Each structure stands twice: as C-alpha cells, then as structure tokens.
Amino acid sequence: MPWWKCSNCGYVFEAEKPPERCPNCGEKCTFYDVSCYTPECGFKGYDPKLVARTPNQESKM
C-alpha cells in the first residue's frame, strides 16, 4: 500500500489512494507519494529521503 505526505502539515500515512482531506490537519492538500521503491529502504514503508525532500507549508514558515 502506498505512503503519502501532506503538503500542508507534513503528515505521513499509508492509504490506497490520497484522501480528499488530510487525516491530520483536515485541509484539502496536495499529497506526495513517498513510498519506498528502492533497495536502500527495503522496498517497503516510506522512503525517508522522499519525505525529507517533499515540501510542506509548515517548513516554509
């Protein structure tokens, strides 16, 4: 199952597809697929490198 990161609050969660609203902040956001697809993170869970690289609103403040 894919992992997603909210563009607003940075929340990372597992779901078949991104929801309409973030389960953490409740906002309508863009969701980035941060699933692990490489050997470095074992092809499972989320990729910490992708989580660190994807922007979110809170990191811009």
Curated annotation (Swiss-Prot):
InterPro entries the record matches: Rubredoxin-like_dom (IPR024934), RUBY_RBDX (IPR048574)
Domain of life, per lineage: Archaea
Entry GO MF terms: iron ion binding
SUPFAM superfamilies listed in its UniProt record: Rubredoxin-like
Domain Rubredoxin-like residue range list: 1-46
PROSITE patterns, per the entry: RUBREDOXIN_LIKE
Protein name (database record): Uncharacterized protein MJ0737
Origin species: Methanocaldococcus jannaschii (strain ATCC 43067 / DSM 2661 / JAL-1 / JCM 10045 / NBRC 100440)
